[in-house]
Regions:
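Active-site beta->alpha N-cap acidic-glycine motif
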Residues: 1-33, 79-82, 105-107, 111-112
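Glycine-rich, often proline-containing surface loops adjacent to acidic residues and nearby aromatics
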Residues: 7-9, 36-41, 79-86, 219-223
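Acidic-and-aromatic substrate-binding clefts and catalytic sites of carbohydrate-active enzymes
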Residues: 11-24, 45-54, 88-100, 126-127, ...
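A cross-domain feature marking catalytic cores of carbohydrate-active enzymes
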Residues: 12-16, 40-44, 85-87, 118-120, ...
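Generic structural signal for well-ordered alpha-helices
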Residues: 24-28, 56-64, 106, 206-209
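Active-site-adjacent pocket scaffolds in enzyme catalytic domains
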Residues: 71-219
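Extended, histidine- and acidic-residue-enriched regions that form the cofactor-binding/catalytic faces
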Residues: 220-233
Length: 233
């Protein structure tokens, strides 16, 4: 347990299109014991704003009614959720338009109760944003893709702006781990059996100093894994 008495916790971003009640029941049991929370993950392709709304609303209903998940916003009374986009293609950010299709996705997510997106970083994918190692607000242009490519940093004492908060994980070049002994590998905060959290990786995570502006002593280190793959459990 930590100084506040909490267990280590994991955010389980479960894919809507792969729903299996017995899997969610087991994750729900872990969450009820204080080991994490359930959030929303989605893979889709050639979709529309209305199609996205239908998928998210249906899955929110399942998570809420059958698994006791998703907190309520005390101000609005609306259910809230965190989000990770499958294939990293948030807001139709792939140049070829695959694995999304919704240019106003950021607005739709905010409308449905999404409090923050946790998709990034995505490098070396071409969905990677220009803005890195940041916690910021993205303002959607409903007629263009990848509106989260830039944004306004979240800052202490400054009201929220834009449409959706984007919480990024560390992204850097690891000069201590080189491909062919020459080219530095991309550190994209992915943890798995084949990419273990070594000391040099953890040092890089800390050095990126992801924080809310005005509060530099609180560092946010968001790492991720495809935890349903048996070798990575």
């Amino acid at each position: 347990r930590d100084a506040d008495g909490f267990h280590p916790q994991h955010s389980f971003f479960y894919p809507e299109e792969e729903y299996e009640v017995h899997h969610l029941d087991q994750l729900q049991a872990l969450c009820e014991k204080g080991f994490g929370e359930l959030e929303v993950h989605l893979h889709h392709d050639n979709d529309t704003a209305d199609g996205l709304r239908e998928k998210i609303r249906r899955f929110m209903g399942i998570l809420t009614q059958q698994h006791g998940a998703l907190p309520i916003n005390k101000r609005t009374g609306q259910r809230m959720f965190g989000f990770i986009h499958g294939n990293w293609a948030l807001d139709n950010s792939r140049p070829d338009g695959r694995w999304c299709g919704v240019n106003d996705e950021i607005q739709v997510l905010a409308e449905l109760g999404c409090y923050a997106d946790f998709t990034l970083p995505s490098a070396p994918s071409d969905t990677q944003t220009a803005k890195i190692n940041s916690i910021y607000y993205a303002t959607d242009d409903p007629h263009k893709p990848c509106s989260h490519n830039h944004g306004v940093d979240v800052a202490v004492g400054v009201p929220a702006s834009g449409d959706l908060m984007i919480v990024q994980g560390p992204l850097a070049l690891n000069w201590r781990n080189r491909k062919w002994g020459l080219v530095p590998r991309i550190e994209n905060s992915d943890v798995r059996a084949s990419n273990q959290p070594t000391r040099d990786r953890v040092d890089l995570w800390v050095q990126q100093h992801i924080h809310v502006q005005g509060k530099p002593d609180w560092i946010f280190i968001k790492v991720h894994t495809h935890g349903a793959q048996e070798t990575d459990m």
